[in-house]
Amino acid sequence: MWNYSEKVKDHFFNPRNARVVDNANAVGDVGSLSCGDALRLMLRVDPQSEIIEEAGFQTFGCGSAIASSSALTELIIGHTLAEAGQITNQQIADYLDGLPPEKMHCSVMGQEALRAAIANFRGESLEEEHDEGKLICKCFGVDEGHIRRAVQNNGLTTLAEVINYTKAGGGCTSCHEKIELALAEILAQQPQTTPAVASGKDPHWQSVVDTIAELRPHIQADGGDMALLSVTNHQVTVSLSGSCSGCMMTDMTLAWLQQKLMERTGCYMEVVAA
């Protein structure tokens, strides 16, 4: 059971600005009803000053989605579009005195809706790169651009964090490999001046990534698959799918990976399945 702050509960039970804004001239739609999360953000913006005079929302989702949308409207009313555009999903979460890690995607959805509304006001069309080469998660309709912004804005480094912040990979899990590849590419493009440990990444992260990459072809040959979720304090958490999920050989597969990791790192590593 997740622990919610009193402020989250307040904005859930008493949402601010949960209404349709008449004569809205900036509307942003994100998410999908079929995916279980959808948000429409409506703004009335002064055309001359670009000050947001009124904001309202309609959302379909969990309590955190309602609270995040409510908080967002409180944060942006009275500010110019330029000022509002600088608001991050972390500021939305902070305004609510925090959100559970598994619910951070709700604050990201609010930021994405604001981004879409500002583009709508300016007559611009956000690039929805949903062609086969860019759509990463079909279950939740999450594209590479969405993942890239979440990673860069929040310093994400693991598959588990991407799932929590975007919902990508939270369904059938078949896109985990695509997410890992996209994550690796995004991280590789970031400045290399920040040490891995300082960015929140475990010092053994790369060794674990390389080891799993070497073992995956053998696992896939037997109809299974493995994805890295996190590396924390010598504990490696992975997800198993396909024939590996719940099979009698699961413990042997984890022990095999554990042995390989200890050989590579020269220290004790515990491997567990999520």
Swiss-Prot record:
Pfam families: Fer2_BFD, NifU, NifU_N. InterPro entries: BFD-like_2Fe2S-bd_dom (IPR007419), BFD-like_2Fe2S-bd_dom_sf (IPR041854), FSCA_dom_sf (IPR034904), N_fixation_NifU (IPR016217), NIF_FeS_clus_asmbl_NifU (IPR010238), NIF_FeS_clus_asmbl_NifU_C (IPR001075), NIF_FeS_clus_asmbl_NifU_N (IPR002871). One of its GO terms (molecular function) is 2 iron, 2 sulfur cluster binding. [2Fe-2S] cluster binds at residues 137, 139, 172, 175. One of its GO terms (biological process) is iron-sulfur cluster assembly. Its cofactor is [2Fe-2S] cluster. The keyword Iron-sulfur applies. Keywords: 2Fe-2S, Iron, Iron-sulfur, Metal-binding, Nitrogen fixation. Binds 1 [2Fe-2S] cluster per subunit. Belongs to the NifU family. May be involved in the formation or repair of [Fe-S] clusters present in iron-sulfur proteins. This is Nitrogen fixation protein NifU. It comes from Klebsiella pneumoniae.
